[in-house]
């Protein structure tokens, strides 16, 4: 094995024109707001890539240097740097960031960062909030990323300790330009790779002693119940655990299939593949390879150990020979048999033979890059190992408690990870262990999972703990099934956002303050987040109110007009509100003019391939555009020639509303040559004036009422992918008008209050409409009921 394949991509050497250097210091001007500072007593500086940083080849920014003799002054449009040329100290290195209050925008070396935080290594045993590590966004406008203690990357693909006791850090002084800050972080530390398409479907996972027969029966039950999954996660009991001879210790680490449970592993994995599942196996590699393992003889021989000695092969990711053997003799053979990627469940600390080198980082780095060996797209599944870990998706967040407190923390935890570029977390949806059974909690957690980077249902080894929808009450079973189907419908949208995350440096999930950093309210709703270009999500993390039968989520609605994803209800933005929903829905809002492509699913369909049938949601607004991006889904490299784009636009003016699907452009071989389109126009209640394909009237168009979105559905079948579709509505097409009294009636009908109060409230609303608010406020109503009524009567357009 050539270990050079493990060298990080990028050019770690900066441009000479960007450098200001002295006998013991070097300052590198990467951008006008991103500066590298190094100090070395021995006068040596680091030009190799590190575990954190792989590219310093930035265009030289504009800057000015004023040499004041003993002091050095550097100016850019964003920063003033004042440095005394000595060993870095609070009095000797000061940076002022442009804009904001002067007292808040000044940093002295050694100041404790006051940033918006980033993420954490794991949520293991978390029962609510945990401490997070630092990120690169700050309301003060600056942050520091310390790279002094990471290893350097050698040309041979191995990591090496850095020489001397040198200071090496990066100053980010972007003010509130959070998105620009993040994009330059990716340029410095490597981009987020493109994920395989199948990762965006649902994942099934359970710590349970499955047998091959039981697992197949489960998959067939999912098919019968029409519950789609695309990834089968097989936890540790795939290998020998309890049957390991005591002389070898525990069976926590293992590489030998348990043939009692899985008598024919290749056949089992082939069966799963034929049923549309990719496969990942759990592995705890810390105990190395012991003599009972089937692979032991060949592993021992390759490591220079006599197999007859039964001497264990110790786990050591600092040994090139072990790395080669580990992959070629343990993992590659099982990948040949059908394993698609590995769940690296490392829980054994941060110590290796090399001081300061974290074995988790080594596993993530080498596993991810090695996973390309079969000509497929790289993927691993493991815990976070510090800044730069975004290069090794997907993240496994660990073993959380099954409690409302755990659920309440996860939306914030997920969104906040974008502050250190970590955009692809996978949580134990529904929680892993301990806690309690609460069907409503499970339903809300699944809803969050569907609107999360990954949706992986999981539970621990307990006969009472499982996430099969049919194990819950009928209402929650329905909710789980509906949302799991929705996740697979969302794959076209999610995969387009996957491309955006990799190429544009824009994570799928982003905190609300990214786009409105000067609005105080955006910092007050940590559980709200943007979900791609078109949506914002406000998960419900509290129990249903007993009076209304609804639960609420504190929500900041950004400026503009927003529409409920599920029912089309319109909201005026620019305010913070409580949004109330029953168990069947959650607050997901889409901006006006949004176009959202979905897979059109009928019955059971767990395929994540580029769909033949597409469903497109079109929301009101003057204009909108969405470019659907598709490729082969698992090609090893992200090349322009792999992609096909389908541009969709919507315009609405005094002449009417026009929606166009342009002819597909690019590598059309990767999509169906003919497609059917189900286009759902929210709030437009007339049939189109005209439907054309390539300019010719399409007489076979079908029309239906869209009761969910109070609009019209237009259906076109078997349209060539290289054809243009155009749907035109007349300027006077009927538009849905909300019936506020009817909406209030539906709330009152279910409310657990006196009939007299129901009648009184309804009478007031019938008479006064949206002007009823002052009267309702004076009626001493239950606070929850009043909150629901306020949402209906005050937030519409």
Q: How does the language model describe each region?
A:
Residues 5-6, 30-69:
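A low-complexity, Ser/Thr/Gly/Pro-enriched, surface-exposed linker/loop concept
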Residues 27, 35-37, 74-81, 536-539, ...:
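Short, well-ordered beta-strand segments enriched in hydrophobic/aromatic residues
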Residues 36-42, 545-558, 667-687:
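Surface-exposed beta-strand/loop patches in extracellular or lumenal glycoproteins
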């Amino acid at each position: 094995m050539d270990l050079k394949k493990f060298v990080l991509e990028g050019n770690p050497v900066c441009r000479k024109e960007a450098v200001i250097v002295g006998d013991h210091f070097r300052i590198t001007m990467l951008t006008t707001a991103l500066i590298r500072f190094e100090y070395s007593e021995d006068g040596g500086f680091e030009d190799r890539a590190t575990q954190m940083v792989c590219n310093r080849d930035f265009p030289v920014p504009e800057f000015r240097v004023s040499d004041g003799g003993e002091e050095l002054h550097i100016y850019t449009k964003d920063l003033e740097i004042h440095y005394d040329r000595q060993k870095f100290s609070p009095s000797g290195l000061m940076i002022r960031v442009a804009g904001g209050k002067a007292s808040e925008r000044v940093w002295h070396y050694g100041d404790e960062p006051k940033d918006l935080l980033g993420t954490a290594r794991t949520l293991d045993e978390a029962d609510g909030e945990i401490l997070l590590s630092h990120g690169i966004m700050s309301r003060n406008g600056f942050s520091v990323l310390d790279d002094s203690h990471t290893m350097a990357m050698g040309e041979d693909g191995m990591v090496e300790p850095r020489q001397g006791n040198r200071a090496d850090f990066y100053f980010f002084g972007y003010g509130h330009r959070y998105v620009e800050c993040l994009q330059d972080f990716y340029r410095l530390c490597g981009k987020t790779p493109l994920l395989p398409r199948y990762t965006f479907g649902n994942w099934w996972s359970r710590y349970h002693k499955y047998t091959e027969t039981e697992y197949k029966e489960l998959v067939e039950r999912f098919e019968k119940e029409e519950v789609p999954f695309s990834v089968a996660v097989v936890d540790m009991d795939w290998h020998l655990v309890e049957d390991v001879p005591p002389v070898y210790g525990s069976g926590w680490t293992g590489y030998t299939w348990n043939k009692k449970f899985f008598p024919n592993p290749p056949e089992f994995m082939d069966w799963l593949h034929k049923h549309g599942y990719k496969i990942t196996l759990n592995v705890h590699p810390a105990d190395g390879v012991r003599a009972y393992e089937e692979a032991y003889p060949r592993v021992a021989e390759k490591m220079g150990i006599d197999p007859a000695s039964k001497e264990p092969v110790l786990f050591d990711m600092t040994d090139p020979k072990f790395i080669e053997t580990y992959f070629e003799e343990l993992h590659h053979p099982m990948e040949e048999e059908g394993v698609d990627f590995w769940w690296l469940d490392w829980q054994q600390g941060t110590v290796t033979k090399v001081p300061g080198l974290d074995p988790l980082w080594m596993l993530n780095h080498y596993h991810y890059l090695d996973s390309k060996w079969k000509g497929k797209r790289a993927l691993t599944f493991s815990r976070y190992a510090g800044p730069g870990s975004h290069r090794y998706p997907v993240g496994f967040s660990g073993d959380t408690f099954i409690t409302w407190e755990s659920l309440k923390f996860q939306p914030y935890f997920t969104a906040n990870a974008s502050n250190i570029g970590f955009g692809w977390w996978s949580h134990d949806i529904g929680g892993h262990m301990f806690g309690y059974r609460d069907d409503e909690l499970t339903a809300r957690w699944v809803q969050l999972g569907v609107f999360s980077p990954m949706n992986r249902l999981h539970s621990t080894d307990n006969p009472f703990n499982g996430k099969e929808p049919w194990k819950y009450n009928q209402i929650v079973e329905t909710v789980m099934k509906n949302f799991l189907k929705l996740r697979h419908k969302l794959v076209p949208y999610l995969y387009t956002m996957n491309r955006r995350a990799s190429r544009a440096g824009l994570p799928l999930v982003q905190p609300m303050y990214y786009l409105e950093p000067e609005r105080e309210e955006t910092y007050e709703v940590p559980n709200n987040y943007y979900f791609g270009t078109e949506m914002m999500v406000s998960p419900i993390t509290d129990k249903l109110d007993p009076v209304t039968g609804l639960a609420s989520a504190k929500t900041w609605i950004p400026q503009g007009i927003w529409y409920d994803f599920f029912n089309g209800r319109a909201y005026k933005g620019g305010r913070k509100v409580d949004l109330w929903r029953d168990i069947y829905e959650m607050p997901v809002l889409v901006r006006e003019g949004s176009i959202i492509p979905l897979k059109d699913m009928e019955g059971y369909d767990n395929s994540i391939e580029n769909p033949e049938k597409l469903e497109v949601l079109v929301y009101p607004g003057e204009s909108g555009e969405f470019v659907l991006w598709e490729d082969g889904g698992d090609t090893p490299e992200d090349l322009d020639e792999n992609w096909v784009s389908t541009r969709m636009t919507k315009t609405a003016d005094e002449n009417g509303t026009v929606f166009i699907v342009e002819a597909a452009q690019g590598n059309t071989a990767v999509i169906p040559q003919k497609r059917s389109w189900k286009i759902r126009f929210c709030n437009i209640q007339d049939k189109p004036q005209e439907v054309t394909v390539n300019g010719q009237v399409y007489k076979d168009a079908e029309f239906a009422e869209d009761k969910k979105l109070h609009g019209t559905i237009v259906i076109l079948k078997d349209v060539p992918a290289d054809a243009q579709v155009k749907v035109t509505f007349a300027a006077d097409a009927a538009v849905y008008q909300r019936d506020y009294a009817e909406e209030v009636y539906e709330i009152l009908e279910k409310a657990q209050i006196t009939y007299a109060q129901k009648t009184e409230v309804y009478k007031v609303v019938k008479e006064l409409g949206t002007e009823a608010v002052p009267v309702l406020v004076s009626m001493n109503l239950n606070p929850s009921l009043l909150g629901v009524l306020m949402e209906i009567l005050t937030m519409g357009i």
